[in-house]
Amino acid sequence: MGKPSSMDTKFKDDLFRKYVQFHESKVDTTTSRQRPGSDECLRVAASTLLSLHKVDPFYRFRLIQFYEVVESSLRSLSSSSLRALHGAFSMLETVGINLFLYPWKKEFRSIKTYTGPFVYYVKSTLLEEDIRAILSCMGYTPELGTAYKLRELVETLQVKMVSFELFLAKVECEQMLEIHSQVKDKGYSELDIVSERKSSAEDVRGCSDALRRRAEGREHLTASMSRVALQKSASERAAKDYYKPRVTKPSRSVDAYDSYWESRKPPLKASLSLRKEPVATDVGDDLKDEIIRPSPSLLTMASSPHGSPDVLPPASPSNGPALLRGTYFSTQDDVDLYTDSEPRATYRRQDALRPDVWLLRNDAHSLYHKRSPPAKESALSKCQSCGLSCSSSLCQRCDSLLTCPPASKPSAFPSKASTHDSLAHGASLREKYPGQTQGLDRLPHLHSKSKPSTTPTSRCGFCNRPGATNTCTQCSKVSCDACLSAYHYDPCYKKSELHKFMPNNQLNYKSTQLSHLVYR
């Protein structure tokens, strides 16, 4: 944008001359040519002049500050609009035309501001200072606040130029009304059209396209910001879900629910076979998880009060004292979980009458031996009902309890096994060489309780009767031959499968490792 070229200036001067000629021809009576009926050609020429490309809008109006007057009126007066401004400029143009056509007439030398047309078309649309500035350019001065009076000398050329610019202002209002009709659906107001027209050198079509593109860009930006806001809110919700504290309550699904309650159950103590937990263990010992099975030599030793000389090997002198340790256990198992039909007190009473078994461990050879404590009297008891002599506490004929001799008093120091390790070592040596020792009279001091020895027999884990000759290799459950065929479908508690029973004479010393220490 810049100053108009000489061609543009010449085009404006030609239009001004045609405008003056058009209005002067209305009052010229000397010429016989036909008067022009409409100023349509002047309007088209004025539109072309106002739409000249690359011409600064400042040079469109020189005597009237058109865009400033329109902006102040639209902002300050609620009754003002582009159409109302078009009417106000048209009335002021009429005042100027009458003044330069009939300067001698007195009615045009004064303008009453309280008349109806002036109040309705001019004062309701334009500000008072703007009206005063325009009329001052024509030669009018305000008088007593109710009228404008013409000065003595009238500059006809100045009045013609002001009237011509008022004509251009009227045409410019028509163009801005056309632009507003094209872009009002985009949310533009008349004031936005005036601002765009004031700063743009484009014609009507160019201004309309520019406003439409700007509106579309604003809509696209708004939509993009809305999408960004939605994505941000969605990401915030996802982050809240991700960092939400986890529920520590177990799931209600089948697996988690079952595992939760299985972990809450107390450990089931198996009491169906020869499994036993040690009463007192040494924390420093590295005990192996193994099951010790009875051997023929152990059974031979258990049948004799003094044992067999081939069972306990001589201890090496280099091992020193405290190599032989003893732990007390009961020979009978706990109540059967499968065939328990009698009160538990009965079995507790029977357990109190059963003899004890001592387990001796030799640290030098890592062997476990099973033997019964020495007895001072016969282990056979006679049944008071049928008169049958039995080695166990239960009659094998009538299943009645047998009366056993009273047990000897426990040792004064039952739990101090470490202080009697040398005594136990000496007892084992005297047991192997009976001719050079004085007997095993001091051995009972190592135990917490001594009872008459009996022939070791295992009770069936199903029927609780003596004579169990089969043992499960997985859970150590024992069974007799009769129950082995009757309960072959019984599941093993160690694994989710059936029992694997084997005869006792075919068992090895080691079996499948369990998660607990088992002594036989």
Swiss-Prot record:
Motif PIM motif in this chain: 327-344
Keywords: Cytoplasm, Developmental protein, Necrosis, Nucleus, Phosphoprotein
InterPro entries per the UniProt record, alphabetical: SPATA2_PUB-like
GO molecular function terms noted in the UniProt entry: protein-containing complex binding; signaling receptor complex adaptor activity; ubiquitin-specific protease binding
Residue ranges constituting the PUB domain according to the UniProt record: 84-156
Modified residues annotated as Phosphoserine in this record: S253
Tissue-wise expression: Present at high level in Sertoli cells, but not detected in spermatogenic cells (at protein level). Low expression in spleen, thymus and prostate.
A cellular component term, taken from the record's GO annotations: cytosol
Membership in a protein family: Belongs to the SPATA2 family.
Quaternary organization: Interacts (via the PIM motif) with RNF31/HOIP (via the PUB domain); the interaction is direct. Interacts (via the PUB domain) with CYLD; the interaction is direct.
Function description: Bridging factor that mediates the recruitment of CYLD to the LUBAC complex, thereby regulating TNF-alpha-induced necroptosis. Acts as a direct binding intermediate that bridges RNF31/HOIP, the catalytic subunit of the LUBAC complex, and the deubiquitinase (CYLD), thereby recruiting CYLD to the TNF-R1 signaling complex (TNF-RSC). Required to activate the 'Met-1'- (linear) and 'Lys-63'-linked deubiquitinase activities of CYLD. Controls the kinase activity of RIPK1 and TNF-alpha-induced necroptosis by promoting 'Met-1'-linked deubiquitination of RIPK1 by CYLD.
UniProt name for this protein: Spermatogenesis-associated protein 2
Organism in which the protein naturally occurs: Homo sapiens (Human)
